[in-house]
Amino acid sequence: MKAFMLAGISSGIGKTTISMALMSAFDNVSPFKVGPDYIDPGFHEFITGNPSYNLDMFMMGEQGVRYSFLKHHKNISIIEGVMGLYDGIDNTLDNNSSAHLARFLGVPVILVLDGVGKSTSIAAQVLGYKNLDPRVNIAGVIINKVSSAKTYSIFKEAIEKYTGVKCLGFVAKNDSLNISSRHLGLLQAHEVDDLKEKLQILKNAVLENIDLVELEKIATEQTRNIEEKVSDIAYPLYLSNLKDKYTGKTIAIAKDSAFSFYYNDNIEFLEYMGFKIRYFSPIKDAVVPECDAIYLGGGYPENFAKELSGNTSMIDSIRDNYEQGKSILAECGGFMYLSNGIENTEGKISEMCCLAPCLVNMTNKLDISRFGYISITNKDGLEIAKGHEFHYSKLKTVIEDTRKFKAVKKDGRNWDCIFNGKKMYAGYPHIHFFGSYKLLEELF
């Protein structure tokens, strides 16, 4: 099989921009994203026309990651890394980083670094990344923000001479390419005007000086041989008892501009469990479609607070379904929708569903005290899920003893994280079902 990972020496180095261009350059690409991010996969899908899947060692486990990677392979798999190559949950080398994942899957790494303010010393940088964990196959480098072809030739000679790593090309310094990273930080793919035109400009600029033939050769020859046929790949055995367990049942999934953060593997796993899926819009629809359960994913409800609050018939329908004992799973933005209300940064409150007894207060900065990977434990201290928190809001006026589950960090820090009433699980954590099947069994 053909595959490679594009990883950077740090965040903001240009790997997303270059990943997008490379995904547009090959045919029938299987796009993947390391970690829990929702935004980048949306751009992957827009570019390739194929679903993009997250590969997260913490939330999915080794078996889950392996399944997803093999099952969804098409002509060539391109994995976009996260943060710096070796950055993970701690400073070990088995830390769920991009390097850890590449090593586990046996795929070559193409390292992205920038050429600003460097000369021969750029080789030392590459050598350091190569030698930190020799088990990681750094098979090539692409240099971003290069001032000229002559400068690149200096970089190339030094890197190949002192490290043995092949230089695959460079991206010229071009401030106009920054538009993509700016959009990626704020908007989803469907919200960017003239995205096709912008991507074509990006593709032309980035691929002008990259050796695609050599890159494809590396992807073909240096990916560890996989014996299994993709069609034979099955879900991990520990998930097999859930196959068709809910046949005949329907789950209604919120999907619109306010709620769009879903892992493709999660949706497919609901179908594997037997659920029929019906989508609805809490912004535009009058009621929840006929169903046995409701799934409210993450997104940006704060940006549509007026519309959501004003759609009182939908709010009443959500409440009615809850009172009827329907199961409700609500993650982050979906949880905010179930709260008593969302208070914006100016102090204005928009009333929501009033099922989770708290008020959500928007802020202008990431809540770093409630950020990152967590294990979710029940009242007996048993882990029922693995998740990730990332939010710019905090809770106010929380009624005590209404949250029955704790978020536990690797360093021992913990906090109450999920509101639980009747058949409702609502909280900030985003979960991947491969590592959270116990929660699903309790809920459904």
Segments from the language model and where they lie:
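C-terminal and late-domain segments of enzyme folds
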Residues: 102, 206-209, 244-247, 259-269, ...
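Residues that mark the start of a beta-strand
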Residues: 3, 28, 248-250, 276, ...
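Cysteine-nucleophile active-site neighborhood
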Residues: 277, 301-378
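Structural motif
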Residues: 5, 78-80, 110-112, 142, ...
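Phosphate-binding active sites in nucleotide-utilizing proteins
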Residues: 239-243, 247-312, 316-323
